[in-house]
Regions:
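Well-ordered, non-transmembrane segments within structured domains
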Residues: 1, 5-16, 22-24, 29-30, ...
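Face-selective signature of the C-terminal outer-membrane beta-barrel domain
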Residues: 70-88, 109-201
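Sequence/structural signature of outer-membrane beta-barrel proteins
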Residues: 13, 37-39, 51, 88-90, ...
Length: 201
């Protein structure tokens, strides 16, 4: 049986859907979310800019999505896949209505991407194994722009322009194998191996 819902709020909306793919064997769950703050602030900025000496521009919004799929091979063997993606965007700047004024613009976009997979297997009544793998990524991009009219002694003037970009990212890859062994009700042994790779740029 499929289930879903949609929620609409003042600043954001979200939706969710879940249900079976193969009856009694696999299922899925997907959810999304998105803000619309920029749709609310845009009319306000338009009204303010009509009476101001500078035209302000800016806003913020984000979205994200989650998805997961489960699959049961047997009563002793299960696997899953999961995924997440999210992004944020921010902007702030102003344009002067005077030709001799100053314009500036600042933009920042950042987000995450995460993917993982796992397999759980009951080897026997005393030994349980779990194998997982995952990938994560974070990215950030900043843009700064500025231009201005600079007067000079000859009164001709010059236009000064500057633009800068800054990018950064972090990525991780993770692999893990773990075992849970219970020889009897009074003893428990856990063992395994883990690999983690970091990349910065």
């Amino acid at each position: 049986e499929y289930h879903g819902n949609i929620s609409i709020g003042l600043l954001a909306a979200r939706a969710n859907l879940e249900g079976p793919i193969i009856k009694d064997r696999s299922s899925f769950n997907v959810s999304v979310r998105r803000t619309w703050m920029e749709l609310i602030t845009w009319p306000l900025m338009t009204a303010v800019n009509k009476k101001a000496d500078t035209e302000w521009k800016g806003g913020y919004h984000f979205y994200d999505m989650n998805a997961k799929v489960d699959y049961s091979f047997t009563d002793r063997s299960r696997a899953y896949l999961s995924f997440y993606m999210g992004s944020d965007s921010y902007r702030n700047g102003e344009d002067s209505k005077d030709i001799h004024g100053e314009d500036r613009d600042f933009r920042w976009r950042w987000g995450n991407l995460i993917g993982s997979a796992g397999w759980n297997y009951l080897i026997n009544r005393k030994l349980f194994a779990t194998f997982t793998g995952g990938y994560t990524r974070y990215r950030s991009h900043i843009i700064q722009k500025q231009n201005a009219f600079v007067s000079s002694p000859d009164k001709n003037g010059q236009v000064y322009f500057q633009e800068g970009h800054y990018r950064s990212a972090m990525e991780d890859v993770n692999l893990r194998a773990s075992f849970d062994y219970r020889p009897n009700v009074d003893h428990r042994i856990r063992m395994g191996s883990d690999y983690l790779f970091h990349l910065f740029r």
